[in-house]
Design a protein with these regions (language model features):
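Conserved pre-ATP/AMP-binding loop-to-beta segment of ANL
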Residues: 20-22, 169-189, 196, 219-224
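Conserved AMP-binding/adenylate-forming core of the ANL superfamily
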Residues: 24-83, 100-105, 202-205
Length: 581
């Protein structure tokens, strides 16, 4: 008998065991007293609504195996449609709308979708830019249709009601197909922060393994309340039995979030779990710091939400880019002393891989980072095997034990486990570069494209992206090790090492983004020239950075759209090269 594997099964189980528990809450406007209204689904309502939509979509040709672009912002419709597609065995295609029109078009052409479900704004863009015009046969609009045909959500719901009413035994409900562990569940396009976005093919087994890894690693229990600030991660909340509360924010710009929209629901609903990008934690932490020091004017309501400790919080998760100790330190002031900010390490193709908590970072590893050790990302999670192999930019077809590097030596990080995706959609060239076949299991290992090493305690250290290493005639620089040294200066927000061609050779260039003026003590201003002098002095103390002599200030680093934290070093390299022609 084939076992059904599907992330939507968790939803149905919760609807049976905890039907009245709230599954998801999304923000609406504010009442006259200033309190925000929310729309919500209980687990029973979300399960029934996703069943209804699944039946309606199936009746209109969107069924098992049908690749379906879903461009709906976080909302009740987003959750019900996503779980409907999973129940159907359809293949939702998730593409971040913030990756830019050119990359969006390329991703959608590559995905070759047969169906497109989107809000009115997304449908307008589809028509204007010709997305999927050669492959689409089904279009569903969430909202108003403006003459492009297809169906709206009400029509899908009506079709679902008709399909369900056709079942002769009223005790039965519309039945989803039995999806298997290795069956394709979704295609998730990576951010493209280190190249062209590519579609990671997720199986139902990958999602099931992720849910279990998150549950075990962070001891998440049903009934917890989760504040979801990253849309795709929000889908795990119902699967884990949590209540997902969506804040009012622009999810493509977490660095610009209104801190009150984070603090208010934490206090009002007693949030237990918070997932936020480093940029979001930085924004909220800085606002609290500014209010406490009275360096900015603020509304009393903001102070009332931000200043009281958030005693209900049990854990904070932050991912998408390395989280600086200063960000951890600031945000830790909001939560109980025994609560940690965890920084899970992974990628779209494999998550989670390793994890470390803020206590270990702030008490120990930050001091090693400041001396050039890189960023400690912790120990591998249960069920994941991590290897360090020789650095090469060429494909590796088969796994061999001889590929391993000794403990302590920097190499490429390679992972295997049930949450590791096996291929990129219709990109055999990129699959060949990123995957290694294990002939003993028939499964693929994933090359993370990251560099790192294991220390004597079995902790994994991240040293930067393989494609970002700076190779000069004298030595090879690994970005995370170099930047950790210079980032210790209090007037520096962050740095980025890039390689630029000068006099026919590659030379290291350190780009510096200054700390905001309001964050520095007014009595201790520092000029750009003096800051460069002090950075050169810091660098001269370490063999790793002694030869870095060229530095330049950048007003604001270009960063990825998803987390506003991952630095686009390729853009900085082009910018830096132009400065030194």
């Amino acid at each position: 008998m084939v076992t059904t594997v599907n992330i939507a099964l968790h939803l149905t189980q919760m609807a049976t065991s905890h039907p009245a528990q709230l599954a998801v809450m999304v923000p609406l406007g504010r009442r006259s007293n200033g309190e925000r209204n929310y729309a919500s689904y209980t687990y029973q309502q979300l399960d029934e609504q996703s069943d209804l939509l699944a039946a309606g979509l199936d009746a209109n040709g969107i069924g098992r195996g049908v690749r379906t672009v879903l461009m709906v912002p976080p909302s009740l419709e987003f959750f019900s449609l996503t779980f409907a597609l999973f129940k159907l065995g359809a293949v939702p295609v998730f593409v971040d709308p913030g990756m830019g029109i050119k990359n969006l078009g390329r991703c959608l052409a590559e995905a070759d979708p047969a169906a497109f479900i989107g809000v009115t704004k997304a449908q307008i863009a589809r028509v204007l830019f010709g997305w999927g015009k050669l492959s689409l046969s089904r279009v569903v609009t969430v909202g108003r249709r403006l003459g492009w045909g297809g169906l709206n959500l009400a029509a899908i719901q009506q079709a679902g009601q008709i399909r369900q009413s056709e079942i002769t035994n009223r005790e039965l409900r519309w039945s989803a197909p039995a999806t298997t562990r290795d069956e394709t569940a979704a295609i998730l396009f990576t951010s493209g922060s280190t190249g062209v976005p590519k579609g990671a093919v997720y199986s139902h087994g990958n999602f099931a393994a992720q849910v279990e890894a998150l549950r075990q690693t962070f001891h998440i229990e049903p009934g917890e309340i989760d504040l979801c600030t990253f849309p795709l991660f929000a889908l795990f909340a119902p699967a884990l039995g949590m209540t997902a509360i969506i804040p009012r924010m622009d999810f493509t710009k977490p660095a610009r979030v209104n801190p009150q929209e984070i603090a208010e629901p934490i206090l009002r609903f007693g949030i237990n779990n918070l997932f936020g990008s480093p940029a979001l934690l930085n924004r909220v932490g800085r606002e609290v710091q500014a209010i406490e020091s009275r360096t900015v004017s603020f509304a009393p309501k903001l102070a009332n939400d931000l200043l009281p400790p958030w005693t209900s919080v049990r854990r904070v998760l932050s991912a998408g880019a390395p989280v600086s100790p200063m960000i951890l330190e600031r945000f830790s002031q909001r939560i109980p002393q025994d609560v940690q900010i965890f920084t899970p390490y992974g990628a779209t193709e494999s998550l989670p891989v390793a994890v470390i908590g803020s206590h270990e970072i702030l008490q120990e590893t930050r001091h090693l980072t400041a001396r050039g050790a890189g960023t400690c990302v912790g120990r591998p999670v249960a069920g994941v095997e991590v290897e360090i192999i020789e650095i090469t930019d060429t494909p590796i077809t088969r796994w061999d034990e001889k590929l391993r590097k000794p403990q302590g030596e920097v190499g490429e990080i390679v992972v295997r486990g049930p949450m590791v995706t096996q291929e990129y959609f219709r990109r055999p060239d990129l699959t060949a570069l990123a995957k290694i076949l294990d002939p003993t299991t028939g499964q693929m290992l994933h090359r993370m494209g990251d560099l790192g090493y294991f220390d004597q305690q079995g902790r994994l250290w991240f040293c930067g992206r393989k494609s970002h290493r700076v190779v000069t005639p004298e030595q090879t620089y690994f970005t995370e090790q170099v930047e950790g040294i210079f980032n210790t200066h209090p007037a520096v927000f962050r740095t980025a090492l890039v390689g630029v061609a000068r006099d026919g050779q590659v030379q290291p260039l350190l780009c510096v983004e200054r700390e905001s003026r309001r964050s520095l003590p007014a009595a201790h201003p520092i000029t750009d020239a003096n800051l460069i002098t002090e950075l050169l002095e810091i660098g001269s103390a370490f063999e790793l950075t002694r030869a870095i002599k060229t530095m330049v200030f950048h007003p604001r680093f270009p960063v990825d759209i998803r987390h506003n934290s991952k630095i686009f070093r390729e853009k900085l390299a082009v910018w830096g090269a132009a400065r030194f022609k």
